[in-house]
Amino acid sequence: MSAQEIIRSIEAEQLKSNLPEIYIGDTVRVGVKIKEGEKYRVQPYEGVVIARRNGGINETITVRRVFQGVGVERVFLLHSPRIDNIKVLRRGKVRRAKLYYLRGRVGKATRIKQRFDRSL
């Protein structure tokens, strides 16, 4: 067994199997585990998926939302133990792999058409 095969087999054990199909342009709600003292709570973060990177254990999505007039982006490792759940709220109809152009837009210009041919 080569080193790469060993690494792949270890990573395969760590992958989450209950992730939904996530596409660019989707509006998602990510439940992030936050530790406060000794307790854990789940904080929801809702926004539009503007980028998706890599594959395997290091797969990430970038989620953007506007909060109090300021654009906020967070990068989430999909297979991280800190991610409690991911729920797709609506499907977006886009023709780009990365939606970085949304960074320069405000208000109604940031809206994305809804896609109905894919199930939630």
Swiss-Prot record:
Annotated SUPFAM superfamilies: Translation proteins SH3-like domain
Superkingdom in the source lineage: Bacteria
UniProt GO MF annotations: structural constituent of ribosome
UniProt keyword annotations, A-Z: Ribonucleoprotein, Ribosomal protein
Any GO CC annotation of this UniProt entry: cytosolic large ribosomal subunit
Database matches in HAMAP family: Ribosomal_bL19
Family designation: Belongs to the bacterial ribosomal protein bL19 family.
Function in brief: This protein is located at the 30S-50S ribosomal subunit interface and may play a role in the structure and function of the aminoacyl-tRNA binding site.
Name this protein carries in UniProt: Large ribosomal subunit protein bL19
Encoding gene, per UniProt annotation: rplS
